[in-house]
């Protein structure tokens, strides 16, 4: 502030010195101007002064802010300290209390123990008192306790404490009395708090009681006021019914008789001026002069009319007080009140016509809503809503409601289009009456309006009527004028306005939709209102509308119940007889919903069915996905789909490359699932490669069967054999007793799998692959879980193309379209057949039909000129119970493994025109089971040898049998067919596969079918159907020219080779038996390749 003073002085000096220096600066010319320096100095000083002031202000603000912050921080610090102290005190008290309780319990226990030998009567009673603490602790406790009590006690309750006396007192006495004193103080404090709380509560209750009494008094006063007002209204009613108002001459009485007759007999005559609302501005101008003269008289008459109206609908409408009507009429006339609502009229207008009869005080009171329907011919219109006194002596206004069944049809064709005719009728009616009778002094309604209402007032919605009855101030306009011209004009205006606004007030204001009301007794009609003055359309009814429905709807509308919507479809569709209201262009359309309800119900049922199908499909798809290969997921994993255009390329590659290709087809959609039906129709028209899987990377060291894949036992009874007899038969029922190996989890899936018959075509005669229950039996083991499925239905014998064949993941299924080419799951040449290639283990006790499995495994493989080709050759083994049959040049071999351990089926697919065959390999060595003992391996070996010896002997004996009958066909049509085992075949585990010619397999199939008691004609049928279809993969051109005897010799050699191979595998798997089986030096080499190109069989073994 001090620094600002010089600046201010210098600024003032500068300002004063400025004007004298300016002329000097101008006069200087070229000489230096001293005034410029002065101006600069003044400018700088001003700037500095301003900055100084700003800095000072900022400094003040900062100081104030710092002061506030400091005060706030101090306050918070104090509050925090207080809070912390309170917390500490509370914790200390809790600790002390707990310690005191513990000490007391300890003393009690000690006393009991020490005084156990003393009788109970002589024992000292335990006195709960604190032990005597040391002197320092006692003083400290006393001081702290007194401080606490002084802090907690209010000032007026705080006792005067002599601290010196307390300090000098003995610690023992103080320690004893301290807690007692503290307890006493605490009790006093609590008592004082309770008293204060009680006082506050008493004050609140007293206040509430006073308020309640006041409210009750006010209610009583209001009730008294209302009762007085009611008495006044009664007096007014007496005045209304007195002789002065009811006295009429004979002419008026005659007119009323005519009017009554007109109302009841001929409503279409001149009294057809229906209830006209007083809502027009023209009416306002027309009636303006009438009501300016005598407002009081008008108010009385208006009140009387309102009272009559309230009697008309007294069950649901409030009664307007006469004082309110006086106030309202004095403030705003009735037409003004109504005209103010013209833009959004919520209420039904009523025109009150009143007639009195000479014989009694009763009245004929006609009231009608603004929405009416006029009948051109006047049929059944006067009966719709006429209020008249049925008993002249009662003086009560009663409502005569017509029987609503009597007028089902109500013509409204000219209801709103005859404004001119109505006007003329009104004019003629007005002429008939005398002007003197229309005077205001008569207090009578000379022109009662015939009420032709669509809905009677008690059927109207409650909202509009409530507002009307409190504000119905209409009097017949005739009462207000002595001139016929005015009457004509007003009637014309009334009719015109009727045409404009009559149609708008059917529903309560919450509908917000102007609609043309249709008669509750008439047929349902759709009436649209294009504008405020549009005429009603005479449209035919959309559908039948019984009267009770309309009545029901009207009653609902009166009670405020809206049945226009429901939970689902915004309408009460579940109510059988409810009529649906459709709002269309400010109109309502009522009709029944029976047909639509039925249709919607059907649609809902269909939707539910679709939902169920979808859920089932998803479940079955999940099943297929669960059973899918880990690496060859059926739907969305590594396998690449080969589309239709890529089939020739794969086939060509099969011709050229030396690597082995597993030409199989894995269906995208399982046949077990419901979705398989659609997938069959979609995928079959494509080439078979569309459903194939290219498995070079996904299965590097295995065949298309995944690492954890296995086939489990058949899960259904022998009754399935009868269902699936042709062309392939299920296994024997005795094989159902198999048990899964412990440690392997079998999951049973229920699902109906379609049994199908596959047709495979590939530029050569087709090979028929009948699909049977193997689709439900092909069980995949993924991640240690074996999924067993239920048997499928009976296989159809002739299923057209257009269906898919399902194989468990890793296997291949052939699409059955006759023009499809079998897709191949291609394995890399280097990894398809390693030296330690192993077939899948045979299903232990598996009743899975080998023929069934074969139906899923179309095995047609290209030439395998690799060193592994001999390894790929397999021997088709069958038990005495096994089944084998020939079908169209293809051998169906069936065999089983009885050992109840991990069961795996292996399928080897052979091309009868090729030497080498790509077998279905099982897993790599790490996944093979090592549990089988030496005795089990030896037993298997012996059983296999015995079986094959017996089978070869049977074949030589039955050289002219069915097997030999089709031997020459096999040389040309070789198809490696999966086994339909009804017998158990044991293969030493771990033994590698070898090949057997198709002639042997053919014979074995036929023999197995014979052993399984299959009729010969069915065997022939199966073989013939198989013969009609050729394997159509890339086969070499060198056609086999070996005879059946040569093929027998070759098969015998291959049989020996395979036996050696089994022994080798057994030794490799079980080194403990090496000493007994080291007699064969050929074990170190692979088996020789088959010399016959038609070698084709399937081997199922257990390892």
Swiss-Prot record:
Chain intervals with Basic and acidic residues compositional bias: 723-735
Region (Disordered): 1-36, 380-409, 723-812
Compositionally biased intervals (Basic residues): 736-748
Name of the featured protein: Centrosomal protein of 126 kDa
Principal place of residence: other
Positions with biased composition (Polar residues): 763-784, 798-812
Source organism per UniProt: Mus musculus (Mouse)
Any one annotated GO CC term: ciliary base
Subcellular localization: Midbody; Cytoplasm, Cytoskeleton, Microtubule organizing center, Centrosome; Cytoplasm, Cytoskeleton, Cilium basal body
Coiled coil (residue ranges): 43-116, 182-222
Keywords: Cell projection, Coiled coil, Cytoplasm, Cytoskeleton
Pfam family, one: K1377
Listed Low complexity bias regions: 1-12
Signal peptide extent: none
Subunit structure of this chain's protein: Interacts with DCTN1.
Function: Participate in cytokinesis. Necessary for microtubules and mitotic spindle organization. Involved in primary cilium formation.
UniProt xrefs under InterPro entries: CEP126
BP terms from Gene Ontology: cilium assembly; cytoplasmic microtubule organization; mitotic spindle organization; non-motile cilium assembly
């Amino acid at each position: 502030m001090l620094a600002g003073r010089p600046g201010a002085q210098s600024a003032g000096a500068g300002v004063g010195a400025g004007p004298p220096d300016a002329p000097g600066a101008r006069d200087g010319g070229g000489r230096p101007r001293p005034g410029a320096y002065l101006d600069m100095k003044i400018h700088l000083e001003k700037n500095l002064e301003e900055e100084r002031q700003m800095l000072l202000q900022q400094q003040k603000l900062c100081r104030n802010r710092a002061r506030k912050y400091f005060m706030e921080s101090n306050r918070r610090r104090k509050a925090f300290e207080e809070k912390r102290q309170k917390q500490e005190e509370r914790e200390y008290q809790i600790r002390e209390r707990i310690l005191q309780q513990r000490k007391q319990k300890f003393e009690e226990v000690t006393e009991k123990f020490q005084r156990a030998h003393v009788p109970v009567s002589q024992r000292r009673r335990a006195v709960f008192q604190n032990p005597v603490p040391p002197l320092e602790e006692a003083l400290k406790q006393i001081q702290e306790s007194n401080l606490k009590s002084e802090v907690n006690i209010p000032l007026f309750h705080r006792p005067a404490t002599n601290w010196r006396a307390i300090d000098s007192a003995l610690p023992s006495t103080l320690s004893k009395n301290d807690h007692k004193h503290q307890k006493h103080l605490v009790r006093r404090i609590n008592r004082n708090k309770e008293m204060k709380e009680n006082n506050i509560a008493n004050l609140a209750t007293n206040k509430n009681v006073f308020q309640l009494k006041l409210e009750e008094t006010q209610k009583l006063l209001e009730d008294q006021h209302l009762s007085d007002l009611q008495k006044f209204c009664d007096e007014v009613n007496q005045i209304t019914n007195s002789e002065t108002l009811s006295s009429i001459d004979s002419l008026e009485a005659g007119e009323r008789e005519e009017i009554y007759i007109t109302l009841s007999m001929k409503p279409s005559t001149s009294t057809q001026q229906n209830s006209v609302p007083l809502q027009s501005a023209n009416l306002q101008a027309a009636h303006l002069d009438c009501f300016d003269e005598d407002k009081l008289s008008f108010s009385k008459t208006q009140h009387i009319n309102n009272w009559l109206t309230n009697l008309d609908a007294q069950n649901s409408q409030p009664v307007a007080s006469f004082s309110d009507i006086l106030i309202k009429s004095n403030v705003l006339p009735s037409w003004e009140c109504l005209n103010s609502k013209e833009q959004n009229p919520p209420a039904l207008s009523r025109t009150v016509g009143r007639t009195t009869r000479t014989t009694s005080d009763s009245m004929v009171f006609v009231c009608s809503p603004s929405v009416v329907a006029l009948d051109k011919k006047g049929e059944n219109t006067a009966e719709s809503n006429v209020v008249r006194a049925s008993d002249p002596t009662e003086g009560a206004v009663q409502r005569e409601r017509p029987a609503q069944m009597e007028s089902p049809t109500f013509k409204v064709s000219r209801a709103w289009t005859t404004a001119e005719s109505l006007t003329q009728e009104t004019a003629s009616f007005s002429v008939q009456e005398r002007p003197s009778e229309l005077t205001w002094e008569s207090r009578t309604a000379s022109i009662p309006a015939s009420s032709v209402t669509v809905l009677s007032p008690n059927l109207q919605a409650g909202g509009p009527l409530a507002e009307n009855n409190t504000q119905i101030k209409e009097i017949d306009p005739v009462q207000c004028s002595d001139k016929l011209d005015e009457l004509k004009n007003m009637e014309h205006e009334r009719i015109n306005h009727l045409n404009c606004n009559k149609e708008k007030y059917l529903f309560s204001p919450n509908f917000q939709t102007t609609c043309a009301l249709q008669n509750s007794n008439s047929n349902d009609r759709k009436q649209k209102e294009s504008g405020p003055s549009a005429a009603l359309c005479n449209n035919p009814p959309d559908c039948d509308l019984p009267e009770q429905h309309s009545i029901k709807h009207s009653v609902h509308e009166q009670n405020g119940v809206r049945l226009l919507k429901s939970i689902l479809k915004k309408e009460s569709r579940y109510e059988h007889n409810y009529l649906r209201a459709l709002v269309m262009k400010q109109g309502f359309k009522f009709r029944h919903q029976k047909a639509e309800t039925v249709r919607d119900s059907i649609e809902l049922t269909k939707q539910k069915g679709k939902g169920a199908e979808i859920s089932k499909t998803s479940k079955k798809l999940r099943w297929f996905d669960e059973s899918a290969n880990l690496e060859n997921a059926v739907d969305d994993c590594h396998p690449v789909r080969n589309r239709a255009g890529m089939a020739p390329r794969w086939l060509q590659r099969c011709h050229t490359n030396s690597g082995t290709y597993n030409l199989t087809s894995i269906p995208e959609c399982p046949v077990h699932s419901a979705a398989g039906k659609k997938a069959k129709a979609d995928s079959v028209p494509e080439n078979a490669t569309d459903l194939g899987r290219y498995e070079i990377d996904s299965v590097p060291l295995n065949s298309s069967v995944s690492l954890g894949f296995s086939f489990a036992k058949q899960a259904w009874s022998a009754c399935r054999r009868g269902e699936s007899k042709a062309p392939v038969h299920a296994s024997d029922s005795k094989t159902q007793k198999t048990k899964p190996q412990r440690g392997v989890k079998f999951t049973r899936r229920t699902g109906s799998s379609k049994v199908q018959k596959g047709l495979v075509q590939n530029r050569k005669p087709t090979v028929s692959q009948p699909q049977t229950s193997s689709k439900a039996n092909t069980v995949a083991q993924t991640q240690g879980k074996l999924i067993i499925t239920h048997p499928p239905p009976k296989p159809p014998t002739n299923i057209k193309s257009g269906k898919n064949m399902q194989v468990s993941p890793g296997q291949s299924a052939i699409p059955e379209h006759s023009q499809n080419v079998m897709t191949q799951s291609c394995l890399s040449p280097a990894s398809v057949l390693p030296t330690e290639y192993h077939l899948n283990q045979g299903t232990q006790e598996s009743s899975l039909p080998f023929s069934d499995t074969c139906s899923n495994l179309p095995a047609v493989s290209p030439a395998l000129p690799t060193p592994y080709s001999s390894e790929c050759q397999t021997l088709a083994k069958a038990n005495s119970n096994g089944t084998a049959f020939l079908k169209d040049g293809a051998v169906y071999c069936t065999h089983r493994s009885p050992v109840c351990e991990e069961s795996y089926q292996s399928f080897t697919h052979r091309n009868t025109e090729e030497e080498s065959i790509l077998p279905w390999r099982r897993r790599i060595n790490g996944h093979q089971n090592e549990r089988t003992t030496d005795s089990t391996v030896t037993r298997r070996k012996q059983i296999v040898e015995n079986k094959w010896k017996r089978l070869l002997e049977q074949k030589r004996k039955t050289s002219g049998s069915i097997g030999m009958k089709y031997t020459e066909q096999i040389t040309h049509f070789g198809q490696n067919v999966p086994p339909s085992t009804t017998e158990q075949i044991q293969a030493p585990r771990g033994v590698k596969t070898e090949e057997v010619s198709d002639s042997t397999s053919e014979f074995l199939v036929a023999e197995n079918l014979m052993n399984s008691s299959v009729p010969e004609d069915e065997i022939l049928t199966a073989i013939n159907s198989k013969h009609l279809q050729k394997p159509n993969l890339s086969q070499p051109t060198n056609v086999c020219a070996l005879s059946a005897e040569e093929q027998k010799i070759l098969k015998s050699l291959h049989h020996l080779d395979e036996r050696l191979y089994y022994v080798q595998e057994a030794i490799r798997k079980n080194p403990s038996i090496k000493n007994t089986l080291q007699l064969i030096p050929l074990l170190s080499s692979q088996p020789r390749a088959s010399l016959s190109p038609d070698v084709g069989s399937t081997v199922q073994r257990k390892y």
